[in-house]
Amino acid sequence: MNKNDSQTGRVRIGVAGAGKMGNVHIRILSELDGLFDLVGVYDPIPERAEIAEKYRAKAFHDFDAMLREVDAIVLPCPTSLHKEMALRAADKDVHVLVEKPIAETLADATAMYDAFEKKGLKFTVNYVERFNPVVRTISDLAPGLDMVSVEVHRCSPFDSRIYDVDVVTDLMIHDIDVVVNSIFKAEPEKVKAIGRYVYGSKFADYAQALLEFAGGAAAFITASRCTEDKIRDIQIHAKGAYLEGDMLRRTLVVKRGVTYEDDANPKINYTQSNLTQQIVLQDKNPLKEELENFGKAILHNEELLNSREQVMRTMSVLDRVEYALYGRRG
């Protein structure tokens, strides 16, 4: 940690962007007061920055002024601003957690990581589902599964506040990250995608992606912001096993095929049934877990659970899905 609140041993942190996601970060950071000292909130719209007063923090109307008073920042601002604002933070020796996606291009993402690593600063991206207990448990179980296919659905009603990105960057990116980093831990060999424009002609509001991996296993990912329900589910089909998870309700069921030989009756070679196991998961807030990981990485040099390799893998596959949809980056 380059700069430190030496009196309290906490990370002095600010939030740059007080929109929908920014408000969530602000609230949770205020709850983690044993780890973070929420110094302030910056937003170019002055009235939005005033949310800081609710948490006894300072409203900043100048980003660089906030950088001078903090050890770290969270950047829940538009993707187009990520590179510029992150590099300004790195220049002031400030650690950064940035919202997904990391940047508009792979080249920008590389430049951002290089800048922070050169200065020995912590830098990570908010792929919050990686901290979901359903995903963490599936990640632990995945190496022992003879995988056939994975199906993931992330569906929501239309939100008029999301106007600058398509459904792949807005929603599907979370499940791309889960599939390539928590389940297969590899980049797919082939990527295909289809999409539908529902609420406008600029961005797809519904998309399906097919990721084909070495060995023949596949992942089917559906993302929708035109579904009149909120769905966050995952199904895994494997040889002798089936897993069904709900990332919203944080439940996971594992069903395994069980074969019994009947020694008493040689005419019956076996009977077959399913063993169903309801996995007991810890009820933890994934974003709180992620922010704790960020804070402990700064204070105690603990490993960031979203690594550079993983973030770049997700970004690469995101680009491939966008290209399959549009013939270009979306």
Residue ranges and their predicted role:
Residues 217-290, 307:
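NAD(P)-dinucleotide binding in Rossmann-like oxidoreductases
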Residues 103-162:
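A contiguous active-site-proximal alpha/beta segment in oxidoreductase catalytic domains
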Residues 61, 98, 123-125, 245:
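Hydrophobic residues in well-ordered beta-strands that form the structural core
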Residues 1-55:
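N-terminal Rossmann-like dinucleotide-binding module
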Residues 25, 55-113:
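Beta-loop-alpha module in the N-terminal Rossmann-like domain of NAD(P)-dependent dehydrogenases
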Residues 1-10, 72-75, 214, 293-330:
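C-terminal helix-rich "cap/oligomerization" subdomain common to oxidoreductases
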Residues 159-229, 233-235:
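Rossmann-like dinucleotide-binding domain that binds NAD(P)(H)
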